[in-house]
A protein has these predicted regions:
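C-terminal catalytic histidine-bearing segment of alpha/beta-hydrolase fold enzymes
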Residues: 379, 384-391, 791-831
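N-terminal targeting or regulatory segments adjacent to alpha/beta-hydrolase or S9 domains
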Residues: 437-578
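Short beta-strand/loop motif that positions the catalytic acidic residue
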Residues: 770, 776-778
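Cap/lid segment of the alpha/beta-hydrolase catalytic domain
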Residues: 618-671, 728-737
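Hydrolase active-site cap/lid region
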Residues: 700, 704-749, 805
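N-terminal cap/lid segment of alpha/beta-hydrolase-fold proteins
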Residues: 560-603
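Active-site mouth of glycoside hydrolases
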Residues: 26-293, 302-327, 333-353, 357, ...
């Protein structure tokens, strides 16, 4: 064991552990309506096999408590809180392919260091809110199990498959279920284990919530096709389950079965075992390699076969589970590394793909509240080092997921297996999320904007896949991130639709509301939204400089002095007999060539004209020339953008020329917006009493600027307007503030000087000049042009005005289904 590796993995895990590994008071798991329930909350889980946990916890041979604690921390951080653990091995140490040290040396004679290790393991798991499935027996040789009990009962020496062959081994251990003396030795062992009191906590095992369930054994089999043998096997399983329940009624009991494969291929036999009323849930195992679905040289090519067979195997067992309403746990599955390698760090492409598929089955079941409730992959190698010489485990080697009879690294998942670890982490997070009730804020009635005297009621719609008792918190903060208030509610959710309501009384402004569910002291986010309260009362004072009007008057005079030199280039491929398309070029402020796309009706007459101002960095899009046959449409490309952008040109326009108001990019861009009006009004077919404009984002800002600088626009419809309220804008959004501030710093400007320059181009300083009707659309969730900045400009408009809020929209307001119709209805008033 390398201490540095422990430290490194702990560093990775610490961020998660700080918030989620608080010591909570756990409770016993129970089954209700086919669901695992703990602390009144159902549990679908991803766990792992950690068979050697009790050995690591001991202070004797093989013990390594520092590693144990590091492994538990890592597993907890990865979201795996269910560990399947061997109580202890049986028989003397030193037997080939048997793990050591063992727990039970002879019937009723124990190596207490292993028991103390198990005590320590359970105590440490309890501290982390983790739970153990403890299996007591084993049908295989690697921990003694059946063969050792038969040897103690005088049935001959326990055989080793590697020495005598698989068939001979199976024949010998098939006697276990009919050997009364061997079974009685085991029943005595069960009594001793289940009745134990933990020496670390002083708590009887039967009262320890760190135990998820008792398990009869690892892959218990009857190894016999005859009806008498199978009946004896069923009797053994039922008797053991009843014995455990009589000793400990608090904990679940499970079989440890592989499913049909471990029941001589008989689903009815598996069903009979699990119909036992003392067996609380059903187990299956799946081994694509061991069962020859894939071989060493077909791990990749036969992966689809393995996945298909896996689904079939799961489904056929779930069909039986439905009859009894019992959960199913796939508590063992594994897949070899690529090219059948064993070394840490070798690729695991096929394993990762197989794991992803199996994990997806649990996620689907969790969402639906299904009976497929948990899985434990085999097995956790964690921080183990690998021997440079031993393929199979030898005393002194680190324990890993592969017991002594298997190649070390065959099925182990090590902490350094980054791709597999990422798959596991993604799965545990997805399953945890799937277990939560679905939540959304009900914003349809008022679009998330509350007006008038409060308090106002914010409703939340919840959909639960199962009955849940839960605590909820609603955290409200300003859009600047300042905490306002946290509201708490407890609720008993029924399966299906539910609702919560919170009464809010807030000052004018925009806010962030986040809904959390609280479990075991840990908050998990369910939903978030932005909200607005009386946005038309938001006060964002103008900061016009004394020469603001003079500056723009001079700019417009300078623009007027530039001959436009309009040039229309026909675009026949985008024209028809209804409207003709042209690429337009013209001169603007400073002699800069700008351009645009024009659609003009073919028929003679006077037509209304619509100017479209484009978003930041947008490309020109070509319309159907027949779409608006009675409309002139002109899409402006401002300087350096769209048609005017040079190959390889950076999109840093928002920061260009920031050192001086006369050189700042948007002085020219705003002049370009006015030049577009000049052009449209110059057309013979334009009805100059019906010239309108609209634009999105940057186009929204240009629409506002154009209307404030030129009264020839008769109505405008900006959406998600850009460039509003710079001082607040740069706090609320990272862009465009970051590049502008960086350019200002490079130019040696103070913040005060930067904001002074920007004030000449702040849309809120323009909108009081607008003389035409306005309709504005905003996205309530817009992170690029936050609603606060939209209303900073809107609230200075003095003419007829209205606004529309799309409560679920981010910045893409122009894609909202209702906005084109709303614009059309608005402009229809003035056509």
């Amino acid at each position: 064991m390398k201490p540095t590796r422990i430290l490194s993995i702990l560093t990775i895990a610490s961020a998660v552990l700080l918030c989620s590994c608080q010591a909570q008071k756990p409770s016993f798991v129970r089954v209700e309506d086919g669901q695992f329930v703990c602390e009144n909350y159902p549990s679908h889980f991803v766990g792992t096999n950690f068979w050697y946990g009790a050995i690591l916890g001991s202070e004797g041979v093989g013990g390594d408590r520092a590693r144990l604690e590091a492994e538990l921390d890592t597993l907890k951080a990865l979201g795996m809180t269910n560990l399947r653990v061997l109580v202890g091995g049986d028989g003397p140490d030193g037997i080939p392919t048997r793990v050591s040290p063992t727990l039970q040396k002879e019937p009723g004679v124990y190596n207490d260091t292993i028991f103390w290790g198990l005590d320590y393991l359970l105590a440490e798991m309890a501290e982390r809110n983790m739970k153990a499935v403890l299996y007591i027996n084993n049908s295989w040789e690697w921990s003694g199990g059946y063969g050792m009990y038969l040897e103690w009962a005088g049935a001959g020496k326990a055989l080793i498959p590697a020495e005598v062959g698989y068939t001979a081994y199976c024949n010998s251990v098939s006697e276990f279920v009919t050997n009364e003396k061997a079974k009685e030795f085991f029943y005595d062992h069960v009594r001793h284990v289940v009745s134990r009191t933990n020496t670390v906590t002083g708590k009887p095992y039967k009262d320890d919530p760190a135990i998820f369930s008792w398990q009869i054994g690892n892959e218990p089999r009857c190894f016999r096709p005859d009806s008498l043998g199978q009946a004896a096997f069923v009797d053994f399983m039922w008797t053991t389950a009843a014995l455990i329940k009589s000793l400990d009624p608090n904990h679940l009991v499970s079989s440890g079965s592989e499913g049909r494969h471990g029941c001589e291929g008989s689903l009815p036999l598996w069903e009979k075992v699990h119909s036992c009323p003392d067996i609380d849930y059903m187990n299956i195992h799946i081994w694509p390699y061991n069962w020859s679905w894939v071989r060493e040289n077909t791990l990749k090519t036969n992966l689809p076969i393995a996945i298909a067979n896996t689904d079939e195997y799961i489904n056929e067992h779930l069909a039986i589970a439905e009859k009894y309403g019992k959960p199913v746990v796939l508590e063992e599955f594994g897949f070899p590394r690529d090219d059948f390698q064993f070394a840490q760090g070798t690729p695991t492409t096929s394993r990762d793909a197989y794991y992803k598929h199996v994990f997806s089955r649990i996620e689907e079941s969790a969402k639906a509240g299904g009976l497929f409730a948990g899985l434990n992959f085999w097995g956790w190698g964690g921080l183990a080092s690998q021997s440079e010489t031993n393929i199979y485990w030898q005393p002194g080697d680190d324990y890993c997921g592969d017991p002594a009879q298997e190649q070390q690294g065959l099925n182990s998942v090590y902490a350094c297996d980054e791709s597999t670890i990422a798959v596991i982490k993604t799965a545990t997070e997805a399953i945890s999320k799937a277990l939560l009730p679905e939540a959304r804020f009900v914003l349809e009635q008022n679009a998330g904007i509350f007006e008038g005297e409060g308090p106002h009621t914010l409703e939340v719609s919840l959909n639960a896949a199962r009955e849940v008792e839960a605590d909820f918190e609603l955290e409200v903060s300003t859009d600047f991130g300042e905490a306002v208030q946290t509201f708490s509610k407890s609720a008993e959710l029924v399966k299906g639709p539910n609702g919560l309501a919170f009464d809010l009384g807030l000052e004018p402004g925009f806010y962030k509301a986040v809904l959390y569910i609280v479990r075991n002291g840990v908050r998990t986010e369910l939903a978030r939204t932005n909200l607005g309260f009386d946005p038309e009362q938001i006060i964002s004072a103008q900061d016009k400089q004394p020469d603001f009007e003079e500056f723009w008057s001079n700019t417009l005079q300078e623009l007027a002095s530039v001959a436009p030199e309009y040039k229309l280039i026909p675009l026949k491929e985008h024209s028809n007999d209804v409207r003709e398309a042209f690429r337009v070029e013209m001169k603007s402020l400073g002699g800069e060539t700008i351009s645009g796309l024009l659609y003009m009706p073919v028929a003679e007459g006077k037509y209304p004209a619509m100017i479209s101002y484009m978003g930041y960095g947008s490309d020109v899009w070509y319309a159907d020339p027949s779409s608006n046959p009675q409309m002139i449409e002109f899409m402006l490309c401002i300087r350096n953008q769209a048609f005017n952008r040079q190959p390889g040109e950076k999109d840093d326009w928002c920061a260009r020329g920031i050192a001086d108001k006369n050189t700042y990019y948007y002085r020219g861009a705003f002049a370009d917006a006015v030049r577009a009006i000049d052009f449209v009004c110059s057309l013979d077919k334009t009805d100059t009493d019906r010239v309108f404009a609209s634009g999105e984002s940057q186009g929204g800002a240009l629409t506002f600027a154009a209307a404030s600088l030129d009264d020839r626009l008769k109505a405008i419809a900006p959406s998600a307007p850009f460039l509003c309220d710079y001082p607040d804008y740069f706090v609320l959004a990272g862009w465009p503030g970051d590049p502008i501030k960086a350019a200002a710093k490079e130019a040696g400007m103070s913040d005060e000087d930067m904001y002074k320059v920007l004030s000449y181009f702040d849309i809120k300083n323009f909108t009081d000049r607008i003389q035409c009707p306005v309709i504005m659309a905003i996205g309530l969730q817009d992170p690029v042009c936050p609603p606060h900045t939209n209303f900073a400009a809107y609230n200075h408009i003095k003419t007829e005005k209205s606004w529309i809020c799309y409560p679920l929209s981010g910045h893409n307001v122009w894609q909202q289904e209702g906005w084109p119709v709303a614009k059309e209805d608005f402009f229809e008033k003035y056509l």
